[in-house]
Swiss-Prot record:
Main location: cytoplasm
Name the UniProt record assigns to this protein: ATP-dependent (S)-NAD(P)H-hydrate dehydratase 1
GO cellular component: cytoplasm
UniProt keywords, alphabetically: ATP-binding, Cytoplasm, Lyase, NAD, NADP, Nucleotide-binding, Phosphoprotein
Pfam families noted in UniProt: Carb_kinase
InterPro entries noted in UniProt: CARKD, Ribokinase-like
Residues annotated as binding ATP: 280-284, 300-309
Keyword check for Phosphoprotein: yes
Catalytic function, reaction form: (6S)-NADHX + ATP = ADP + phosphate + NADH + H(+); (6S)-NADPHX + ATP = ADP + phosphate + NADPH + H(+)
Gene Ontology MF terms: ATP binding; ATP-dependent NAD(P)H-hydrate dehydratase activity
Residues given in the record as (6S)-NADPHX binding sites: 187, 240-246, 310
Signal peptide (from-to): none
Amino acid sequence: MVLTTRHHLDGFRSIQVMLGALEHPLDVMKASKGRSCSENDHRMYRFSKNLPRGVCSPLTTGPHPTTHLEPTMHQPHRSLLRKAFQMIPPLDGSLHKGQAGRIGIVGGSKDYTGAPFYSGYASLRLGSDLSHVICEPSASTVIKTYSPDLMVHSYLSSPKEPEAYASHQNLFEQLLDRLHVLVVGPGLGRDTEMQDWAEWTLKTAIKKKLHLVLDADALWLLVKKPDLLRGYPNAILTPNHVEFQRLLKACSIEPRENDDDGLLAMELSKALGGCSILQKGSIDLVAREGSEVAKVSCEGSPKRCGGQGDILSGLVGTWCAWTKLYFERQSQDEKPKSHELPISSEEAWIIAAVLGSEITRTCSRLAYHKLGRSMQSSDMLGYIGEAFELVMHGHTKD
């Protein structure tokens, strides 16, 4: 089987079939034992030849010690992530525009226009079909100039203009009916009017049972009003260290000096009623009430630059959309496909958070190996496709 980069999602679907046809996923690797490296390459994948200098394809022998990708999960989570192939929309001609994910990014204000671009564009680079940015009018023209691939809506207007405000609320609510997931927070800011819009957005989205990703200043809103999300499980929060500490305090959870086991994140998930927590740090921790804590420790970049968290929110958002689409497909199928293993709702949310984190870290690493100290978040966007291939292939191995 020869698969070009253009057909890599078809390849993942094919490998998923192969995995189901064998007694155990590891038999895929055993079945290839005895063939040459080149034969195995052609049988499994043909990866892009444009990897940065010094970065080896995972199918070549003698990988570079700092770029070799290995799954970082404990065995239960590694087995779980193999199920993720089932969630990826197939590229087999059966879908029409929008059926691989319609993403909404709520953010973008007078002072912050880059963040919603990073989030929305990252979602497209991972494989969603349509990405909408809902922003403040003063930010819309600027964001439109960044990319023609984004659809930008200047709905977050001031209530000081009541007629326009009411009209924009109506248009925004109509747009929500077409989306699979809403990422709230990138470039939102803490201005009272923008925070009020975020509150209205969360309340409306929850009524419509939309999948949610909350980042940046949407978490600031949640610190002030934690009851907004309490009891709603269809959400992932992506706090950094400072944001996480604020959320703990808002939920009356006593912080601990050392928390590398994810127990505080689990407590936060329980306090908020079951949403998922992706706690960002040197090791990313993923916690959800009723599930084991997952740790993501694959190599990222030592360079910290603004926008990486926004890229993460867009990637996680795409996986959340694929989660919703997966369960919609399952409900429409009369009987499950014989090669597929069932995925529970709790498992799907863990998969979305973990793989969003792994792909972010991997594209950051690839960009850093190419550009070093000069790397910026904009450089990461071009590596999302390669990072996706590397991460997903890593989860076919023992």
